[in-house]
Amino acid sequence: MTVVREYDPTRDLVGVEDVERRCEVGPSGKLSLFTDLLGDPICRIRHSPSYLMLVAEMGTEKKEIVGMIRGCIKTVTCGQKLDLNHKSQNDVVKPLYTKLAYVLGLRVSPFHRRQGIGFKLVKMMEEWFRQNGAEYSYIATENDNQASVNLFTGKCGYSEFRTPSILVNPVYAHRVNVSRRVTVIKLEPVDAETLYRIRFSTTEFFPRDIDSVLNNKLSLGTFVAVPRGSCYGSGSGSWPGSAKFLEYPPESWAVLSVWNCKDSFLLEVRGASRLRRVVAKTTRVVDKTLPFLKLPSIPSVFEPFGLHFMYGIGGEGPRAVKMVKSLCAHAHNLAKAGGCGVVAAEVAGEDPLRRGIPHWKVLSCDEDLWCIKRLGDDYSDGVVGDWTKSPPGVSIFVDPREF
Protein backbone atom coordinates (compact mmCIF):
# COMPACT_ATOMS: atom_id res chain seq x y z
CA MET A 1 0.00 0.00 0.00
CA THR A 2 1.27 3.47 -0.91
CA VAL A 3 0.70 6.39 1.45
CA VAL A 4 1.17 9.98 0.28
CA ARG A 5 1.95 12.52 2.99
CA GLU A 6 3.79 15.79 3.56
CA TYR A 7 7.58 15.67 3.56
CA ASP A 8 9.16 15.59 7.03
CA PRO A 9 12.82 16.70 6.93
CA THR A 10 13.61 15.03 10.25
CA ARG A 11 12.88 11.51 8.98
CA ASP A 12 12.57 11.65 5.18
CA LEU A 13 15.80 13.32 4.05
CA VAL A 14 17.85 10.15 3.58
CA GLY A 15 15.06 8.35 1.72
CA VAL A 16 14.40 11.33 -0.56
CA GLU A 17 18.09 11.69 -1.42
CA ASP A 18 18.23 7.97 -2.23
CA VAL A 19 15.36 8.32 -4.72
CA GLU A 20 16.99 11.39 -6.25
CA ARG A 21 20.21 9.45 -6.81
CA ARG A 22 18.31 6.65 -8.54
CA CYS A 23 16.46 8.98 -10.89
CA GLU A 24 17.93 10.68 -13.92
CA VAL A 25 16.70 13.67 -15.90
CA GLY A 26 16.98 12.90 -19.60
CA PRO A 27 16.48 9.98 -21.99
CA SER A 28 17.71 6.68 -20.60
CA GLY A 29 20.89 5.28 -22.16
CA LYS A 30 22.25 8.75 -22.99
CA LEU A 31 23.92 11.58 -21.15
CA SER A 32 21.92 12.25 -17.99
CA LEU A 33 21.62 15.31 -15.80
CA PHE A 34 21.82 14.78 -12.04
CA THR A 35 20.97 17.41 -9.45
CA ASP A 36 22.67 17.79 -6.08
CA LEU A 37 20.20 19.64 -3.85
CA LEU A 38 22.89 20.25 -1.22
CA GLY A 39 20.90 18.52 1.50
CA ASP A 40 17.78 20.65 0.98
CA PRO A 41 15.08 18.84 -1.06
CA ILE A 42 12.80 21.90 -1.04
CA CYS A 43 15.49 24.33 -2.23
CA ARG A 44 13.74 24.87 -5.58
CA ILE A 45 10.42 25.90 -4.03
CA ARG A 46 11.27 27.45 -0.66
CA HIS A 47 11.52 30.97 -2.11
CA SER A 48 7.96 30.86 -3.47
CA PRO A 49 5.08 32.50 -1.55
CA SER A 50 3.42 29.14 -0.82
CA TYR A 51 4.88 25.67 -1.30
CA LEU A 52 4.53 21.99 -0.38
CA MET A 53 6.49 18.78 -0.83
CA LEU A 54 4.81 15.37 -0.70
CA VAL A 55 6.39 11.93 -0.45
CA ALA A 56 5.05 8.50 -1.36
CA GLU A 57 5.82 5.82 1.21
CA MET A 58 5.47 2.04 0.98
CA GLY A 59 5.74 -0.74 3.53
CA THR A 60 4.30 -1.47 6.95
CA GLU A 61 7.10 -2.36 9.34
CA LYS A 62 10.02 -1.13 7.23
CA LYS A 63 8.79 1.95 5.41
CA GLU A 64 10.49 3.18 2.25
CA ILE A 65 10.26 6.47 0.35
CA VAL A 66 9.48 5.55 -3.27
CA GLY A 67 8.52 8.92 -4.76
CA MET A 68 8.05 12.63 -4.18
CA ILE A 69 6.67 15.76 -5.74
CA ARG A 70 7.03 19.49 -5.14
CA GLY A 71 4.55 22.26 -5.78
CA CYS A 72 4.20 25.99 -5.26
CA ILE A 73 1.59 28.70 -5.79
CA LYS A 74 1.89 32.35 -6.74
CA THR A 75 -0.05 35.10 -8.52
CA VAL A 76 1.02 35.83 -12.10
CA THR A 77 -0.09 37.76 -15.17
CA CYS A 78 -2.30 35.73 -17.51
CA GLY A 79 -3.54 38.51 -19.80
CA GLN A 80 -4.18 42.22 -20.09
CA LYS A 81 -7.01 44.73 -20.34
CA LEU A 82 -7.53 48.42 -21.01
CA ASP A 83 -7.80 50.65 -17.95
CA LEU A 84 -11.13 52.38 -18.64
CA ASN A 85 -10.73 54.61 -15.58
CA HIS A 86 -7.48 56.14 -16.81
CA LYS A 87 -8.00 59.74 -17.93
CA SER A 88 -5.50 60.19 -20.73
CA GLN A 89 -5.34 60.47 -24.49
CA ASN A 90 -3.26 57.30 -24.60
CA ASP A 91 -4.71 53.88 -23.75
CA VAL A 92 -3.27 52.30 -20.62
CA VAL A 93 -3.05 48.52 -20.48
CA LYS A 94 -3.30 46.78 -17.12
CA PRO A 95 -2.31 43.19 -16.25
CA LEU A 96 -4.86 40.50 -15.49
CA TYR A 97 -3.74 38.21 -12.67
CA THR A 98 -4.51 34.63 -11.76
CA LYS A 99 -3.41 32.27 -9.01
CA LEU A 100 -1.08 29.76 -10.66
CA ALA A 101 0.34 26.52 -9.28
CA TYR A 102 3.52 24.86 -10.50
CA VAL A 103 4.37 21.16 -10.29
CA LEU A 104 8.05 20.23 -10.26
CA GLY A 105 10.46 17.64 -9.01
CA LEU A 106 8.20 14.62 -9.57
CA ARG A 107 10.29 11.53 -8.92
CA VAL A 108 9.40 7.85 -8.65
CA SER A 109 12.00 5.20 -7.82
CA PRO A 110 12.88 3.12 -10.92
CA PHE A 111 11.98 -0.03 -8.95
CA HIS A 112 8.42 1.20 -8.30
CA ARG A 113 7.33 2.70 -11.60
CA ARG A 114 4.19 1.78 -13.55
CA GLN A 115 2.28 1.31 -10.29
CA GLY A 116 0.31 4.57 -10.38
CA ILE A 117 2.50 6.28 -7.78
CA GLY A 118 3.28 9.30 -9.97
CA PHE A 119 -0.41 9.78 -10.78
CA LYS A 120 -1.33 9.58 -7.09
CA LEU A 121 1.31 12.16 -6.17
CA VAL A 122 0.05 14.57 -8.85
CA LYS A 123 -3.60 14.23 -7.78
CA MET A 124 -2.75 14.82 -4.11
CA MET A 125 -0.72 17.90 -5.02
CA GLU A 126 -3.54 19.23 -7.19
CA GLU A 127 -5.93 18.84 -4.27
CA TRP A 128 -3.65 21.06 -2.17
CA PHE A 129 -3.57 23.57 -5.03
CA ARG A 130 -7.37 23.73 -5.11
CA GLN A 131 -7.63 24.09 -1.34
CA ASN A 132 -5.34 27.12 -1.59
CA GLY A 133 -7.29 28.82 -4.37
CA ALA A 134 -5.12 28.06 -7.39
CA GLU A 135 -7.02 28.40 -10.68
CA TYR A 136 -4.42 26.80 -12.95
CA SER A 137 -1.56 24.33 -12.62
CA TYR A 138 1.35 23.92 -15.01
CA ILE A 139 4.43 21.75 -15.42
CA ALA A 140 7.62 21.95 -17.46
CA THR A 141 9.12 18.86 -19.06
CA GLU A 142 11.23 17.79 -22.02
CA ASN A 143 9.52 17.12 -25.34
CA ASP A 144 11.21 13.73 -25.56
CA ASN A 145 10.33 12.66 -21.99
CA GLN A 146 7.45 10.54 -23.25
CA ALA A 147 6.60 9.04 -19.87
CA SER A 148 6.15 12.49 -18.32
CA VAL A 149 4.23 13.86 -21.31
CA ASN A 150 1.90 10.83 -21.30
CA LEU A 151 1.26 11.11 -17.56
CA PHE A 152 0.33 14.78 -17.59
CA THR A 153 -1.40 15.16 -20.97
CA GLY A 154 -3.00 11.71 -20.83
CA LYS A 155 -3.97 10.66 -17.33
CA CYS A 156 -3.88 14.04 -15.58
CA GLY A 157 -5.69 16.18 -18.15
CA TYR A 158 -3.02 18.77 -18.93
CA SER A 159 -2.66 20.29 -22.41
CA GLU A 160 0.43 21.48 -24.22
CA PHE A 161 0.64 25.24 -23.70
CA ARG A 162 3.99 26.92 -24.38
CA THR A 163 7.36 25.83 -25.81
CA PRO A 164 10.04 28.23 -24.56
CA SER A 165 13.72 27.77 -25.29
CA ILE A 166 16.33 27.07 -22.61
CA LEU A 167 19.57 28.70 -23.76
CA VAL A 168 22.75 27.58 -22.01
CA ASN A 169 26.23 28.99 -22.49
CA PRO A 170 29.48 27.76 -20.91
CA VAL A 171 31.51 29.94 -18.59
CA TYR A 172 34.98 30.22 -20.08
CA ALA A 173 38.28 30.50 -18.24
CA HIS A 174 38.68 33.99 -19.72
CA ARG A 175 36.51 37.06 -19.25
CA VAL A 176 34.21 38.05 -22.10
CA ASN A 177 34.53 41.58 -23.43
CA VAL A 178 31.56 43.91 -23.00
CA SER A 179 31.11 46.24 -25.98
CA ARG A 180 32.82 49.60 -25.48
CA ARG A 181 29.81 51.22 -27.13
CA VAL A 182 27.60 50.15 -24.22
CA THR A 183 27.36 51.27 -20.60
CA VAL A 184 26.03 48.75 -18.06
CA ILE A 185 24.23 50.23 -15.05
CA LYS A 186 23.31 48.22 -11.95
CA LEU A 187 19.94 49.18 -10.49
CA GLU A 188 18.86 49.18 -6.88
CA PRO A 189 16.08 46.62 -6.21
CA VAL A 190 13.45 49.37 -5.78
CA ASP A 191 14.42 50.89 -9.14
CA ALA A 192 14.42 47.45 -10.78
CA GLU A 193 10.93 46.79 -9.41
CA THR A 194 9.65 50.07 -10.82
CA LEU A 195 11.09 49.33 -14.25
CA TYR A 196 9.65 45.81 -14.37
CA ARG A 197 6.20 46.84 -13.12
CA ILE A 198 5.88 49.73 -15.57
CA ARG A 199 7.18 47.96 -18.65
CA PHE A 200 6.78 44.21 -18.13
CA SER A 201 3.83 43.63 -15.77
CA THR A 202 1.57 42.66 -18.70
CA THR A 203 4.01 39.96 -19.85
CA GLU A 204 2.66 36.43 -19.47
CA PHE A 205 3.75 34.67 -16.22
CA PHE A 206 5.02 37.95 -14.69
CA PRO A 207 5.00 37.39 -10.88
CA ARG A 208 2.92 39.87 -8.93
CA ASP A 209 5.45 39.68 -6.07
CA ILE A 210 8.36 40.73 -8.29
CA ASP A 211 9.67 42.76 -5.34
CA SER A 212 10.22 39.52 -3.39
CA VAL A 213 12.20 38.11 -6.31
CA LEU A 214 14.42 41.15 -6.73
CA ASN A 215 15.09 41.50 -2.99
CA ASN A 216 15.91 37.81 -2.52
CA LYS A 217 19.47 37.08 -1.43
CA LEU A 218 19.92 34.86 -4.51
CA SER A 219 19.17 37.73 -6.90
CA LEU A 220 22.57 39.17 -7.77
CA GLY A 221 21.27 42.32 -9.38
CA THR A 222 19.39 43.94 -12.24
CA PHE A 223 21.43 45.53 -15.00
CA VAL A 224 20.45 48.00 -17.72
CA ALA A 225 22.47 48.51 -20.90
CA VAL A 226 22.38 51.89 -22.65
CA PRO A 227 24.47 53.42 -25.45
CA ARG A 228 27.72 54.89 -24.18
CA GLY A 229 27.58 58.62 -24.68
CA SER A 230 23.84 58.86 -24.08
CA CYS A 231 22.66 61.00 -21.19
CA TYR A 232 22.26 57.80 -19.13
CA GLY A 233 25.65 56.35 -20.07
CA SER A 234 27.84 59.31 -19.20
CA GLY A 235 29.03 58.10 -15.82
CA SER A 236 28.06 58.01 -12.16
CA GLY A 237 25.06 60.02 -11.09
CA SER A 238 23.42 59.92 -14.51
CA TRP A 239 20.61 57.50 -13.59
CA PRO A 240 17.40 59.51 -13.00
CA GLY A 241 15.25 56.64 -11.72
CA SER A 242 13.32 54.05 -13.70
CA ALA A 243 10.13 56.08 -14.12
CA LYS A 244 11.98 59.03 -15.66
CA PHE A 245 14.17 56.66 -17.71
CA LEU A 246 11.12 55.00 -19.27
CA GLU A 247 9.52 58.38 -19.91
CA TYR A 248 12.59 59.54 -21.86
CA PRO A 249 14.40 56.34 -22.92
CA PRO A 250 17.48 56.24 -25.15
CA GLU A 251 17.14 55.04 -28.73
CA SER A 252 17.96 51.48 -27.63
CA TRP A 253 18.26 49.82 -24.23
CA ALA A 254 17.97 46.43 -22.53
CA VAL A 255 17.53 44.99 -19.05
CA LEU A 256 18.51 41.68 -17.46
CA SER A 257 18.62 40.25 -13.93
CA VAL A 258 20.83 37.47 -12.57
CA TRP A 259 19.85 34.72 -10.10
CA ASN A 260 22.41 32.61 -8.24
CA CYS A 261 21.27 28.98 -8.55
CA LYS A 262 24.70 27.78 -7.40
CA ASP A 263 23.87 28.37 -3.75
CA SER A 264 20.70 26.25 -4.05
CA PHE A 265 21.77 23.26 -6.11
CA LEU A 266 24.55 21.86 -8.28
CA LEU A 267 24.27 19.94 -11.54
CA GLU A 268 26.34 17.14 -13.03
CA VAL A 269 26.30 15.43 -16.41
CA ARG A 270 26.85 11.68 -16.18
CA GLY A 271 27.24 8.99 -18.79
CA ALA A 272 29.96 10.70 -20.85
CA SER A 273 32.66 8.62 -22.52
CA ARG A 274 36.30 8.98 -21.51
CA LEU A 275 37.02 10.66 -24.86
CA ARG A 276 34.46 13.39 -24.22
CA ARG A 277 35.90 14.05 -20.80
CA VAL A 278 39.44 14.31 -22.16
CA VAL A 279 38.40 16.70 -24.95
CA ALA A 280 36.51 18.90 -22.49
CA LYS A 281 39.43 19.02 -20.08
CA THR A 282 41.87 19.84 -22.89
CA THR A 283 39.82 22.86 -24.00
CA ARG A 284 39.73 24.19 -20.44
CA VAL A 285 43.49 23.76 -19.98
CA VAL A 286 44.20 25.65 -23.21
CA ASP A 287 41.74 28.41 -22.28
CA LYS A 288 43.30 28.87 -18.84
CA THR A 289 46.89 28.70 -20.12
CA LEU A 290 46.34 31.02 -23.09
CA PRO A 291 43.39 33.24 -22.09
CA PHE A 292 44.43 35.99 -24.53
CA LEU A 293 43.39 33.70 -27.40
CA LYS A 294 39.76 33.92 -26.20
CA LEU A 295 39.17 30.30 -27.23
CA PRO A 296 35.80 28.81 -26.23
CA SER A 297 36.15 25.95 -23.77
CA ILE A 298 33.81 23.18 -22.69
CA PRO A 299 32.84 23.68 -19.03
CA SER A 300 33.56 21.02 -16.46
CA VAL A 301 30.02 19.63 -16.56
CA PHE A 302 31.13 16.06 -15.83
CA GLU A 303 31.62 16.97 -12.18
CA PRO A 304 29.29 19.05 -9.99
CA PHE A 305 28.94 22.61 -11.28
CA GLY A 306 26.84 25.67 -10.51
CA LEU A 307 24.91 28.03 -12.72
CA HIS A 308 23.62 31.57 -12.85
CA PHE A 309 20.19 32.13 -14.38
CA MET A 310 19.44 35.25 -16.42
CA TYR A 311 15.82 36.38 -16.11
CA GLY A 312 13.63 39.41 -16.75
CA ILE A 313 15.28 39.94 -20.13
CA GLY A 314 13.77 42.78 -22.12
CA GLY A 315 14.58 45.84 -24.17
CA GLU A 316 13.56 48.20 -26.91
CA GLY A 317 15.05 49.90 -29.94
CA PRO A 318 16.96 48.93 -33.08
CA ARG A 319 20.07 47.95 -31.09
CA ALA A 320 18.24 46.12 -28.30
CA VAL A 321 19.65 42.75 -29.39
CA LYS A 322 23.21 44.11 -29.16
CA MET A 323 22.39 45.58 -25.75
CA VAL A 324 21.20 42.16 -24.56
CA LYS A 325 24.41 40.61 -25.87
CA SER A 326 26.45 43.06 -23.79
CA LEU A 327 24.38 42.28 -20.71
CA CYS A 328 24.94 38.55 -21.27
CA ALA A 329 28.68 39.19 -21.48
CA HIS A 330 28.47 41.03 -18.15
CA ALA A 331 26.47 38.13 -16.69
CA HIS A 332 29.09 35.67 -17.96
CA ASN A 333 31.81 37.55 -16.10
CA LEU A 334 29.70 37.54 -12.92
CA ALA A 335 29.32 33.77 -13.28
CA LYS A 336 33.07 33.36 -13.82
CA ALA A 337 33.77 35.35 -10.66
CA GLY A 338 31.21 33.18 -8.84
CA GLY A 339 32.82 29.91 -9.91
CA CYS A 340 29.93 28.73 -12.09
CA GLY A 341 30.12 26.32 -15.01
CA VAL A 342 27.30 27.74 -17.14
CA VAL A 343 24.89 30.64 -17.50
CA ALA A 344 21.35 29.97 -18.67
CA ALA A 345 18.20 31.78 -19.74
CA GLU A 346 14.70 30.72 -20.75
CA VAL A 347 12.76 32.79 -23.26
CA ALA A 348 9.77 32.44 -25.56
CA GLY A 349 10.60 30.68 -28.80
CA GLU A 350 9.62 33.73 -30.88
CA ASP A 351 11.21 36.35 -28.63
CA PRO A 352 13.32 38.55 -30.95
CA LEU A 353 15.79 39.26 -28.13
CA ARG A 354 16.86 35.60 -27.99
CA ARG A 355 19.23 36.43 -30.87
CA GLY A 356 21.29 38.42 -28.40
CA ILE A 357 21.67 35.55 -25.90
CA PRO A 358 24.86 33.55 -26.60
CA HIS A 359 24.38 29.80 -26.21
CA TRP A 360 25.71 26.44 -27.28
CA LYS A 361 23.13 24.40 -29.12
CA VAL A 362 24.50 21.15 -27.67
CA LEU A 363 23.85 22.44 -24.13
CA SER A 364 20.49 24.08 -24.86
CA CYS A 365 16.91 22.95 -25.36
CA ASP A 366 15.11 24.58 -28.29
CA GLU A 367 11.67 23.51 -27.11
CA ASP A 368 11.04 23.02 -23.44
CA LEU A 369 7.42 21.90 -23.02
CA TRP A 370 5.04 23.64 -20.63
CA CYS A 371 1.69 21.95 -20.05
CA ILE A 372 -1.23 23.57 -18.25
CA LYS A 373 -4.52 22.54 -16.65
CA ARG A 374 -7.51 24.48 -15.41
CA LEU A 375 -8.15 23.24 -11.89
CA GLY A 376 -11.81 24.14 -11.51
CA ASP A 377 -14.80 24.58 -13.81
CA ASP A 378 -16.53 26.82 -11.29
CA TYR A 379 -14.23 29.75 -12.07
CA SER A 380 -15.84 32.34 -14.33
CA ASP A 381 -14.09 33.10 -17.60
CA GLY A 382 -14.08 36.80 -16.74
CA VAL A 383 -12.13 39.14 -18.98
CA VAL A 384 -9.30 36.78 -19.84
CA GLY A 385 -11.45 33.74 -20.58
CA ASP A 386 -9.89 30.30 -20.28
CA TRP A 387 -6.13 30.93 -20.14
CA THR A 388 -5.37 27.40 -21.35
CA LYS A 389 -6.85 28.32 -24.74
CA SER A 390 -5.03 31.63 -25.19
CA PRO A 391 -2.44 32.05 -27.98
CA PRO A 392 1.21 32.52 -27.01
CA GLY A 393 2.64 36.01 -26.73
CA VAL A 394 5.94 37.25 -28.08
CA SER A 395 7.62 36.91 -24.69
CA ILE A 396 7.20 35.30 -21.28
CA PHE A 397 8.59 36.10 -17.83
CA VAL A 398 10.35 33.08 -16.33
CA ASP A 399 10.44 33.19 -12.54
CA PRO A 400 13.99 32.29 -11.39
CA ARG A 401 12.63 30.74 -8.19
CA GLU A 402 11.23 27.89 -10.29
CA PHE A 403 14.04 27.28 -12.76
Curated annotation (Swiss-Prot):
Induction: By ethylene. GO terms for biological process: auxin-activated signaling pathway; photomorphogenesis; response to ethylene; unidimensional cell growth. Its EC number is 2.3.1.-. Disruption phenotype: Unable to develop apical hook in the dark. Reduced length of dark-grown hypocotyls and reduced leaf initiation rate in light-grown seedlings. Keywords: Acyltransferase, Growth regulation, Transferase. The keyword Acyltransferase applies. Residues 2-177 form the N-acetyltransferase domain. InterPro entries: Acyl_CoA_acyltransferase, GNAT_dom, Plant_NAT. It comes from the Eukaryota. CDD domains: NAT_SF (cd04301). One of its GO terms (molecular function) is N-acetyltransferase activity. It is an enzyme of class 2 (transferase). SUPFAM superfamilies: Acyl-CoA N-acyltransferases (Nat) (SSF55729). Belongs to the acetyltransferase family. Ethylene-responsive N-acetyltransferase required for differential cell elongation in the hypocotyl. Regulates apical hook formation of dark-grown seedlings. May control differential cell growth by regulating auxin activity. May be involved in negative feedback regulation of auxin homeostasis through the control of GH3-like genes. Modulates de novo shoot organogenesis. This is Probable N-acetyltransferase HLS1. It comes from Arabidopsis thaliana (Mouse-ear cress). The gene is HLS1.
